[in-house]
From Swiss-Prot:
Keywords: Membrane, Nucleus, Transmembrane, Transmembrane helix. It is a multi-pass membrane protein. GO terms for cellular component: Noc4p-Nop14p complex; nuclear membrane; nucleolus; small-subunit processome. GO terms for biological process: ribosome biogenesis. It is found in: Nucleus membrane; Nucleus, Nucleolus. It comes from Xenopus laevis. This is Nucleolar complex protein 4 homolog A. Belongs to the CBF/MAK21 family. Its main location: nucleus. The lineage of its organism: Eukaryota, Metazoa, Chordata, Craniata, Vertebrata. Pfam families: CBF (PF03914). The keyword Ubl conjugation does not apply.
Length: 526
C-alpha cells in the first residue's frame, strides 16, 4: 500500500515538473514575441531558485536561450549601466530604458546562475558553468561595452572573474567542477585571463586571511593551476573562445611571452605560502614537467626548491627533479647539494614510493667524471653498507649502481682490491658521519659486496660475484632494474623451467640397511 502511494506521489511530482517546464517554454516564447510580456522574465528567473533539480535545469536552459537572443539582437543596453533604482534623466529614450531594464535582468540572471555553481547537484553545477561560459562567449561577440573601451579585444573579464571566484572557494571543495572547467582552458584567451584573475583572487584571499591561505582554497587553486597547459610555440596560439576581430601586435593573449609571464606570476604568488605535505608533494611531482619549462625565469624557483630540499624525507626526494633542471640547465650553484643528497641515503630510501625516481636522478647527478674521488667513494660505501639489510629486488639495482660508480671513477677500484678488507668492527668508514668528506670511505673497502656473495637469493649472488672478476669498462644499464618489485622476482621464480621427473633408485629400500642385495641386509634384519 505504501509503495503504491509513493509511486502515485512520484507521478504527481513528475506531472508538476512537466507543467513547470511547459510554463517556462510558454513564458520564453511570450518574452521573445513582444516587449509587452517582458515581466515574464521575472517568472523565468524565479524558477532558478526552485528546489527541484529538473526544474532548475529547465530554467537555466530557458534563461540561456532568452539572453542569447537578447545579446544577438542587441536588446541589452551597451555602455555604463546606471543604477536600477536611480532616477534617469530625460535624455534617455524609451528604447534605452527598456534595454537598461533588460540588462539588469541579465545581470540578475548571471548572478543566480553563479550561485548555482554551489548547488548540491553536480549536474546543475555543470550546466550552470557551461551556461556562464556561453554568456562569456556571447558577450565577447556582442560586447556590452562601448567601442571606445580601452581594451580593443573586449574580453568579458568581469564575468570570468565571478566564475573563477566561485570555483576557488575557501571552504568548499570545487575540484570536480574545476576539472569540468579544464576544457575551457584549451582556449588561449580563457587561459590567459584565468591566470590573471586567479592571481588577483589569491592576493585578495591572502590579504583577507592575514597572509595565510585556507587549505581548501589552496587545494582548489592547485587543481586549477595544474590544469593549465602552456603551448610550447607561439604559433600554437590561435584557439580563442571569443573571436579576435582586431589585429593588434601587442595583444597579450596571442603572445607566448605574456602567457609565460602571467603563468610564472600566479605560480610564484601561490607557492610563497606554506603548503600542506600532501600538496607539497603534488606540486613537486609536476614541477619539472608542467611548471619550470613554461616559466620566463625558472631560476625564480630556487628558493622554493632549496627549501623543499631541506625539508627531508619524501619532500627532498621529489625536489631533486627540479633542482637537477636548475643545476644543469640554468647553472644553479648549490654548495651543499651532494652533502644533502648523501644524507638522504637511509634504510627507508629502499621502501619509499619514489625510490625509482630518486635513484634515476642520483645516477644522473653522480654521472660526472669530474666529481672528487672521496665523494664517489662515500656514496658507493654508504650504498654498500645499506645493502646489507636491503631486500633482494633492491639489491639487484644497488649492486650494478655501485659497480657503475667504480667504472666511472677508476681511482675507486681500491675499494674492491684493497687486501685488508676488514669487517664491521675494524672498518674505518664512519656510517654516522653526514659529511662525505669526513666519512673515511676511501680508506675502507667494499667488503659488504663479498658478504652478499653468500646471499640466499641466486640472482643477488650472481650480481655480487661481478667484483670477483675484472670489471668491464661498459656500464650496466640499470633503467630496467629501478622499479623491479618482489612480486616480479617471485613470478620469475615460479616461471622457471622445472624437471619433469627426478631420477631415483628403481629398487625401493627395505629397512635401515639399504637394498636387498647388501651383504648386511642378508644376515641381519631390522
Amino acid at each position: 500500500m505504501a509503495a503504491r502511494k509513493t509511486k502515485h506521489a512520484c507521478r504527481i511530482q513528475d506531472k508538476r515538473s512537466d507543467a513547470e517546464r511547459q510554463d517556462l517554454d510558454t513564458k520564453l516564447a511570450a518574452v521573445l514575441e513582444s516587449r509587452g510580456n517582458a515581466n515574464a522574465v521575472f517568472d523565468i528567473l524565479e524558477h532558478l531558485e526552485s528546489k527541484k533539480e529538473e526544474v532548475v535545469q529547465a530554467a537555466i536552459r530557458t534563461a540561456s536561450k532568452l539572453f542569447e537572443v537578447m545579446l544577438e539582437k542587441r536588446e541589452l543596453y551597451i555602455g555604463d549601466l546606471p543604477a536600477e533604482n536611480g532616477t534617469l534623466p530625460d535624455t534617455y529614450s524609451a528604447e534605452d530604458k527598456y534595454k537598461m531594464w533588460m540588462r539588469h535582468r541579465y545581470n540578475s540572471c548571471a548572478a543566480c546562475i553563479l550561485d548555482l555553481l554551489q548547488h548540491s547537484s553536480f549536474s546543475n553545477q555543470e550546466l550552470a558553468l557551461c551556461t556562464l561560459m556561453k554568456f562569456i562567449q556571447l558577450e565577447g561577440k556582442f560586447p556590452l561595452e562601448n567601442s571606445e573601451w580601452k581594451d580593443s579585444y573586449r574580453f568579458p573579464r568581469e564575468l570570468l572573474k565571478f566564475v573563477i571566484d566561485n570555483l576557488l572557494q575557501e571552504e568548499a571543495d570545487c575540484t570536480l567542477l574545476i576539472t569540468r572547467f579544464q576544457e575551457y582552458l584549451e582556449y588561449d584567451d580563457v587561459r590567459y585571463y584565468t591566470m590573471t584573475v586567479t592571481n588577483d583572487c589569491v592576493s585578495r584571499v591572502q590579504q583577507k586571511n592575514k597572509l595565510v591561505l585556507p587549505p581548501v582554497f589552496q587545494t582548489n587553486v592547485f587543481c586549477l593551476l595544474s590544469s593549465i597547459n602552456i603551448p610550447v610555440e607561439e604559433s600554437a596560439l590561435g584557439n580563442f573562445l571569443v573571436t579576435k576581430n582586431v589585429n593588434n601586435e601587442d595583444w597579450k593573449p596571442s603572445k607566448l611571452k605574456d602567457h609565460k609571464r602571467v603563468f610564472e606570476r600566479v605560480w610564484m604568488i601561490f607557492l610563497k605560502h606554506q603548503l600542506s605535505v600532501s600538496l607539497y608533494k603534488k606540486v613537486l611531482l609536476i614541477l619539472h614537467e608542467s611548471i619550470l619549462p613554461h616559466m620566463s625565469k625558472p631560476t625564480l624557483m630556487i628558493d622554493f626548491l632549496t627549501a623543499a630540499y631541506d625539508v627531508g624525507g619524501a619532500i627532498s626526494l621529489l625536489a631533486l627533479n627540479g633542482l637537477f633542471i636548475l643545476i644543469h640547465q640554468h647553472n644553479l650553484e648549490y654548495p651543499d647539494f651532494y652533502k644533502k643528497l648523501y644524507s638522504l641515503l637511509e634504510p627507508s630510501i629502499f621502501h619509499v614510493k619514489y625510490r625509482a625516481r630518486f635513484f634515476h636522478l642520483a645516477n644522473m647527478f653522480l654521472s660526472s667524471t669530474h666529481l672528487p674521488v672521496y665523494l664517489v667513494a662515500a656514496f658507493a660505501k654508504r650504498l654498500a653498507r645499506l645493502a646489507l639489510t636491503a631486500p633482494p629486488q633492491v639489491l639487484l639495482m644497488i649492486i650494478p649502481f655501485i659497480c657503475n660508480l667504480i667504472r666511472r671513477h677508476p681511482a675507486c677500484r681500491v675499494l674492491i682490491h684493497r687486501p685488508s678488507a676488514g669487517d664491521l668492527a675494524t672498518d674505518p668508514y664512519i656510517m654516522e658521519e653526514q659529511d662525505p668528506a669526513k666519512s673515511q670511505a676511501l680508506e675502507s673497502s667494499l667488503w659488504e659486496l663479498e658478504v652478499l656473495q653468500q646471499h640466499y637469493h641466486g640472482d643477488v649472488v650472481r650480481a655480487a660475484n661481478v667484483i670477483s672478476r675484472p670489471l668491464s669498462a661498459q656500464e650496466s644499464d640499470i633503467s630496467g632494474l629501478l622499479e623491479i618489485s618482489s612480486c616480479e622476482l617471485y613470478d620469475k621464480e615460479m616461471k622457471k623451467k622445472k624437471f619433469k621427473s627426478v631420477p631415483l633408485e628403481y629398487e625401493p629400500v627395505r629397512g635401515l640397511l639399504g637394498l636387498k642385495s647388501d651383504i648386511t641386509a642378508q644376515h641381519f634384519t631390522f
